[in-house]
Amino acid sequence: MKALPVLLIILDGFGCRDERANNAIAQANKPNWDRLWKHHPHTLIHASESEVGLPKGQMGNSEVGHLNIGAGRVVYQEFTRIDRAIESGYFYTNPALLNAVHLARDNGKTLHVLGLLSDGGVHSHELHFHALLDLAAREGLSKVCLHVFLDGRDTPPKSAELYLRRLTDKIAQAGVGHVASMIGRYFAMDRDRRWQRVKSAYDLLTQGAAEFSAGSAQAGLEAAYARGETDEFVKATAIVPADGRPVTMEDGDSVIFLNFRSDRARQLSRPFIEPDFSEFERERTPRLATYCTLTGYSDDFDVSVAFPPERIKNGLGEYVANLGLRQLRIAETEKYPHVTFFFNGGEEVSFPGEDRILVSSPDVATYDLKPEMSAFEVTEKLLAAIGSKQYDLIVCNYANPDMVGHTGNLEAAIKAIETVDTCLGRVVEAQLARGGEVLITADHGNAELMLDAETGQAHTAHTMNLVPVIFVGRRHASLAETGALEDVSPTLLRMMGLPQPPEMSGESLLAFE
């Protein structure tokens, strides 16, 4: 089957906001973007809340965005599924969760609960900790240790005190549990193979090994702030009562990992579940009774899963592959899982005719130190792919607006936008020269808001702002006044001249004149 070649460019974290103040996108010098916006059909679409399968008031994120874009329909997120399970009561009868609780209770062992403690809603939610404490109390389990990872990335940089206080109140109300350790997500939730970061979290969890200790979580947080650390970067801290010892994981204990987003939970899970793990030396390898994850983190993991993924049939990648067409996914490390695993509806393997290019992200502590990231390298690979004329569909992600936006550094974020703009001009020109068309969009907002006016702190989280869509091609066309991320794949199919599969509920934003 013949199809017009199309290029989808996803500008990660590129939201729309009119005010220039603290807006890296508005303040950046971006002649290519400005020209494309002025001279080509464009619109704004929704990328948060119910339009992408999230609860009301919940900002979008990269996982959710790419799932919805690739599926061509609203994908109800694990966050929403879990919240509904708590409301319906199913959470408290979930077989995987009950198994972990009962194994600990019936054998006099400890249940260790791991996860990101915040209300950010991107990787986890504090209310899931609270619900699990209720479950443990209902089932008569007395030994529950909470190992909390601090956020400061999808939440304000110094907001952990609120979540720790609410958790402490819940512990008192439920009558079970105590905080045994805490560490920043920078260490516990690395996804870029910085294994020494992960080792510090693993050693803390398994043997209570930590650079710092405190009598309470609140005291540990105050000490971290005094050292100049913000939530994301809090170093391993064991919470040890005056008359006690650090908590360790023992043979026969159970673990429940409460993160519902997989990409930043995989690396820390591996040393617990892989017998031949070799990325770092493990001083202790407790033989756990069960390792339960709230959602499916990887098809390769032999673990218990409380909420397994739901199959997404006939997403864009699968549909294009079944038509015998060629496609390419390209991104740097930070967003590679999003244009592959998440875009494909949670499928680990590539579809027939699907090629993938991974460009390594720079090895820096934070991306404000190198706001260009690997955008230029991605662009060179992308230009070569366009020039090869092999592909009917190319999906490319530029990570800069999101990853540099997360640092809260306005000047660096402006540089990130300007870098992407330079790349955008080159690849759009190349795709048009090839006789193809381009659709540019974003998965959620971020870089358009770099300061929280209420708190005066850097704004490092995503936003709920609308995201842009630009159609660039030689045909005359118009775009709908609004829509949502589910409409992106139907729009691409319209551009390619292909029918839309019945499983896609989104609608094409594009009308050719």
From Swiss-Prot:
Cofactor: how and how many bound: Binds 2 manganese ions per subunit.
Amino acids binding substrate: H123, R153, D154, R185, R191, R261, S262, D263, R264, K335
Keywords: Glycolysis, Isomerase, Manganese, Metal-binding
EC category name: isomerase
InterPro entries linked: Alkaline_phosphatase_core_sf (IPR017850), BPG-indep_PGM_N (IPR011258), Metalloenzyme (IPR006124), PGAM_B_sf (IPR036646), Pgm_bpd_ind (IPR005995)
The UniProt record lists the keyword Isomerase: yes
SUPFAM superfamilies noted in UniProt: 2,3-Bisphosphoglycerate-independent phosphoglycerate mutase, substrate-binding domain, Alkaline phosphatase-like
Identification of the protein by name: 2,3-bisphosphoglycerate-independent phosphoglycerate mutase
Organism: Thiobacillus denitrificans (strain ATCC 25259 / T1)
Gene: gpmI
